[in-house]
Amino acid sequence: VLTITINRPDKLNALNKTVIEELHTVLDSFYKHPEMKAAILTGAGPKSFVAGADISEFLELDATGGAALAAKGQEQVFSKIENSPKPIIAAVNGFALGGGCELAMACHFRLASEQAKFGQPEVNLGLIPGYGGTQRLTQLVGKGKAMELMMTGAMINASEALQLGLVNYVTPAEELLPKTNSLLQTIIHKAPLAISEIIRLTNLAAIGAENGLQEEINAFGRLFDTADAKEGASAFLEKRPAVFKGK
C-alpha cells in the first residue's frame, strides 16, 4: 500500500500548481506499478489534510486562466483519482477545505481523525468549487445539504461529516493511518479485477448513468472468464482462502 502525503505543512498543505503536478506524477507511477495495490492520501502535520488552494495564485487569473486551472486539476489529479482502477482512500487528518475537501471527495472513500474539518468556502472569495465540489458533494450528502454547505461556506466537524455520509469512519488521530491501512489490507486481498469493476460501476451510478445496469450485467459476465473467478469458486467449495492474482 502506497502512502501519498501532501507535504507543505507551513502552508497547511495548500494545493498550488506544483503540488498538482507532483500529485499527477505520483499517480502515474502508482498506475504503472502492479505491485502497488492501493494508496492512502493524507496531509503532513497534525493540523491540515489540505486547506484549500493557494489563493496567492488566483490574483493573476482571468476567465480563461481560471477555467484552464480547473480543467488541468480535474484531468491530472481529481478525475484520475476517482477513476483509478486501484483503491485510493483519503485519511483526513485535519482541515479539508475547498480544494482539500474536493481532493478527499475524489478518493473512493474517506476516513477522518476527530480533529478533521470539512468545507467548501469558495463563496467567500466570490467563487465556486472548481475541482468537482458541486458534483461530488451533491453525490455524497444530497442536494439540499450540498447547497447549504456551498452557499454558506460553513465548516463542519468530523462527527457531522460522518452523520452526512461524507466520511465512513472517525478515529482518534493516532489510529487514523492504522485503521485506513487495515481496511486496505482487507481490500487488497480480494480479487483486483472485481475491485476495479466495483469502482467503475459505482462511479457510473453516482453520475446517474442510464446504462448502469447493463454495464453491470456485462461486467458480471466478463468476470466469469477470469482465473480469479475460477479460483474464488474453487476456494469457496474447498473451504480454503482464495489466492487472487488479478488475472
Question: Residues of each region from the PLM?
Answer:
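Conserved CoA-thioester-binding segment of acyl-CoA-metabolizing enzymes
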Residues: 1-42, 61, 79
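Terminal peptide-recognition signature
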Residues: 4, 8, 22-23, 41, ...
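Charged catalytic carboxylate motif
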Residues: 18, 22, 73, 80, ...
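Glycine- (often His-adjacent) and acidic-residue-rich active-site loop
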Residues: 35, 43-80, 96, 208
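Crotonase-fold acyl-CoA enzyme core
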Residues: 79-193, 209, 222, 226, ...
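Short C-terminal tail/terminal secondary-structure segment
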Residues: 241-247
